[in-house]
């Protein structure tokens, strides 16, 4: 089995359906004997340029190890699902399990905010 990185963008009005979509896609990978090495829900983000007159989309990143048949099935699901605006499936050499730069940046911002609040409380 090969390793893949999958990113898909969902219509912002369909954000409540994202957990069900993630569950469905991960279940299809696991049923075929594959593994999900990393799953990140990046949430609603600003697009670099409008797509179908939309300026925001809900982003999801998955790193999976799966047979080609599952990847073909996912591509078909993405293509015929109107809620999925764009998708990208890239073959990788090895499993990626570390946090993405998007998540690391978010965690560092949270850590800075916590440190700032703690320093303000200590100063009072």
UniProtKB/Swiss-Prot annotation:
Listed GO biological process terms: translation
Domain of life: Bacteria
Pfam families, per database record: Ribosomal_S6 (PF01250)
Molecular function in Gene Ontology: small ribosomal subunit rRNA binding; structural constituent of ribosome
GO cellular component terms, semicolon-separated: cytosolic small ribosomal subunit
CDD domains: bS6 (cd00473)
Keywords (A to Z) from UniProt: Ribonucleoprotein, Ribosomal protein, RNA-binding, rRNA-binding
Biological role stated in the UniProt entry: Binds together with bS18 to 16S ribosomal RNA.
Record-linked PANTHER family: MITOCHONDRIAL 28S RIBOSOMAL PROTEIN S6 (PTHR21011), SMALL RIBOSOMAL SUBUNIT PROTEIN BS6M (PTHR21011:SF1)
Family: Belongs to the bacterial ribosomal protein bS6 family.
NCBIfam families, per database record: S6
Protein name per UniProt: Small ribosomal subunit protein bS6
């Amino acid at each position: 089995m090969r390793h893949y990185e999958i990113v898909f963008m969902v219509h912002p009005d369909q954000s409540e359906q994202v957990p069900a979509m993630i569950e469905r896609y991960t279940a299809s990978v696991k049923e075929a004997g594959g593994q999900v090495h990393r799953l990140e829900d990046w949430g609603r983000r600003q697009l670099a340029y409008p797509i179908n007159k939309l300026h925001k989309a809900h982003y999801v990143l998955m790193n999976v190890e799966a047979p080609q048949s599952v990847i073909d099935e996912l591509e078909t699901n993405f293509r015929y699902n109107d809620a999925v605006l764009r998708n990208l499936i890239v073959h990788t050499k090895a499993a990626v399990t570390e946090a993405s730069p998007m998540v690391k940046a978010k965690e560092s911002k949270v850590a800075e905010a916590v440190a700032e609040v703690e320093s303000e409380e200590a100063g009072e």
